[in-house]
């Protein structure tokens, strides 16, 4: 700038470079997070590549949640947005957990990790109880009569319940 002290111009320039470095780091972190999320969807949840291919959009982070937002979405800057798209995953303590909304968006054919529940098992699941299982460890889409109910996590012969507490039926 004309007439500005050299010292001030150098400091502003350094601030600009550090801001650029910070933005580059955030972009790199976002890219790594997106790659890790896609890996989780494909390997840990067994989501089919066909389902992934049908989903057009961009992964965005909104708090601790990862959403699939439409490609043509406008900027949310200055807006109060409740949910910017389909909620896919929560990023908790350096691990991902699938969102209930993701489970409801899936059909049986969309994942290879699916279990059809009996009426009694479905009732127990909707009440928030664990279900005995023979499945290997990991996340499983639980369905009843072909409809997705939510996710469970198999561990130690039990299907741990991950049905949202606010939706659980009381006895």
Enumerate the predicted regions with their spans:
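Polybasic, low-complexity RNA-engagement segments
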Residues: 1-171
């Amino acid at each position: 700038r004309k007439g500005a002290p050299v010292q001030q111009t150098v400091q502003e320039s350094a601030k600009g470079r550090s801001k650029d470095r910070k933005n580059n780091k955030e972009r790199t972190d976002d890219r790594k997070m997106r790659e890790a999320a896609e890996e989780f969807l494909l390997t840990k949840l067994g989501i089919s590549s066909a389902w992934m291919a049908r989903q057009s959009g961009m992964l965005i982070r909104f708090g601790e949640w990862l959403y699939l937002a439409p490609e043509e979405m406008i900027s949310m800057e200055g807006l109060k947005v409740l949910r910017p798209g389909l909620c896919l995953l929560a990023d908790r303590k350096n691990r991902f957990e699938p969102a209930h909304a993701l489970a409801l968006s899936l059909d049986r054919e969309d994942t290879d990790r699916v279990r059809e529940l009996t009426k009694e098992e479905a009732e127990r699941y909707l009440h928030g109880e664990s279900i005995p299982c023979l499945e290997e460890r990991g996340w499983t889409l639980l369905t009843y009569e072909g409809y997705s109910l939510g996710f469970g996590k198999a561990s130690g012969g039990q299907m741990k319940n991950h049905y949202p507490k606010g939706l659980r039926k009381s006895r």
